[in-house]
From Swiss-Prot:
Motif ('HIGH' region): 46-56
Residue positions binding L-cysteinyl-5'-AMP: 44-47, 59, 82-84, 227, 249-251, 283
Name of the protein described by the UniProt record: L-cysteine:1D-myo-inositol 2-amino-2-deoxy-alpha-D-glucopyranoside ligase
Source organism per UniProt: Mycobacterium leprae (strain TN)
Cofactor needs: Zn(2+)
Transmembrane segments: none
Length: 412
């Protein structure tokens, strides 16, 4: 194999298997069927009104592992990530701070990308902002109006809504019952009881212009796009239907990812927007999920400013399984710093035990639904042997460091 993300080592890992949210089981990722083909992935990016917290970092770290494993398998990877720079939280924060929303978005996007680079998260092939995709969004909304999948509400502000029943398969990605959908829909800013809507779950596609709000021209009047259609338009215009993975945090399963898929499927007439739906668990702090609205954030930039090594932050997040909801703590960071020190000490030794078996096991664990706890445990075992007993393979320490860099993204 050759580690495509680093310098060369021989060998090749097993095909990637991931938990699919819509199927509720771990199964092979479709790109593995043809190793020479291009693997495609669309992951929802940030709404740039505040700094990157560890919940963001954990999500993008999970998809970074997928990116790295695909490269290790020999795939070319087309990875697209959006920036939701048209959204109420951004406008509200900019108004509160007395700054232009575009300046706030630009500043926070720059900080986000700097944080991601510090954590050695490979950048997407395309970063695409919603404001860069207005033409494509308008085309998508227009197609849904023409087909009858969308309608204009009779109101002072003629907003456009998507019919949740426009596709027969609506609901397959989340698998949630209607009561759960309604609860999550309202929690995420939906308006199930708005007068004039055909259905409670119908989702906003185009918000007609209001005084003091940004707006763009369209054949159906000035306004701005709804949340879900932004991602559908970006994914379809950059990748197309049938992408290998649609991903993001588990808090996006419904309504965001369900509606993004439904919009795309409705326009393209396809049964599935993506072949695999992958979602990362939430990171908590102070007994609650980390979120901007709650304010219980541990910021990547703050940890870095306090002197935490970015590789240790990464290792701390990798210590838990990507799908698990879990809590961050100062003890977790301390443990990661200690582990990083041990790994670096072992990697700097003049010789060590043979690494072929441990590299094969690490690849196998990662290929099995990104089982980073088992991969780390295997590496800890090699490091313990190296530090306690040494070894006779002069190439082993450097070879293992290269593997850790390429597969886990941890720089030794």
């Amino acid at each position: 194999m050759v580690f495509r993300t680093g310098s060369g080592v021989a060998g090749r890992g097993p095909e990637l298997r991931l938990y699919d949210t819509s199927d509720r089981q771990v199964r092979p990722v479709s790109a593995a069927v043809a190793p020479t083909c291009k693997a495609t992935m669309y992951v929802c990016g940030i709404t740039p009104y505040d700094a990157t917290h560890l919940g963001h970092a954990a999500t993008y770290l999970a998809f970074d592992l997928i990116h790295r494993l695909w490269l290790d398998l020999g795939h070319e990877v087309h990875y697209v990530q959006n920036v939701t720079d048209v959204d109420d939280p951004l406008f509200e924060r900019a108004d509160r701070n007395g700054v232009d929303w575009r300046d706030l978005a630009e500043r926070e996007v720059a900080l986000f990308r700097d944080d991601m680079a510090s954590l050695r998260i490979l950048p997407p092939h395309d970063y695409v902002a919603a404001t860069e995709t207005i033409v494509e969004i308008v085309e998508l909304v227009d197609k849904m109006l023409v087909s009858g999948a969308a309608y204009v509400i009779d109101d002072e502000y003629p907003d456009i809504y998507f019919r949740a029943d426009a596709t027969l398969q609506f609901g397959y990605e989340s698998g949630y019952d209607r009561d759960t959908m309604l609860r999550l829909y309202e929690q995420s800013g939906g308006d199930p009881r708005r007068p004039g809507k055909n259905g409670e779950l119908d989702a906003l596609l185009w918000r007609a212009a209001r005084p003091g709000e940004p707006s763009w021209s369209s054949p159906f009047g000035p306004g701005r796009p709804g949340w879900h259609v932004e991602c559908a338009a970006i994914a379809l215009s950059r990748i197309g239907i049938g992408l290998d993975i649609q991903g993001g945090g588990s808090d996006l399963i419904f309504p965001h990812h369900e509606f993004t898929a439904a919009h795309a499927e409705c326009v393209r007439g396809e049964r599935r927007f993506a072949r695999h739906y992958v979602h990362a668990g939430m990171i908590g702090w102070d007994e609650h999920k980390m979120s901007k609205s709650r304010g219980n954030l541990v910021l990547v930039s703050t940890l870095r400013a306090q002197g935490a090594p970015p590789s240790a932050i990464r290792l701390g997040l990798l210590a838990g399984h990507y799908r698990a909801d879990r809590f961050w703590s100062s003890q977790l960071l301390d443990d990661a710093i200690a582990r990083l020190h041990r790994w670096r000490t072992a990697a700097s030794m003049p010789a060590g035990p043979d690494v072929a078996d441990v590299i094969a096991r690490v690849r196998g664990y990662l290929a099995d639904d990104l089982d980073t706890p088992k991969a780390i445990a295997a590496l800890d075992g090699w490091v313990t042997d190296a530090l306690e007993y040494g070894g006779h393979d002069a190439a082993a320490p450097k070879l293992l460091a290269t593997a850790i860099d390429a597969l886990l993204g941890v720089d030794l």
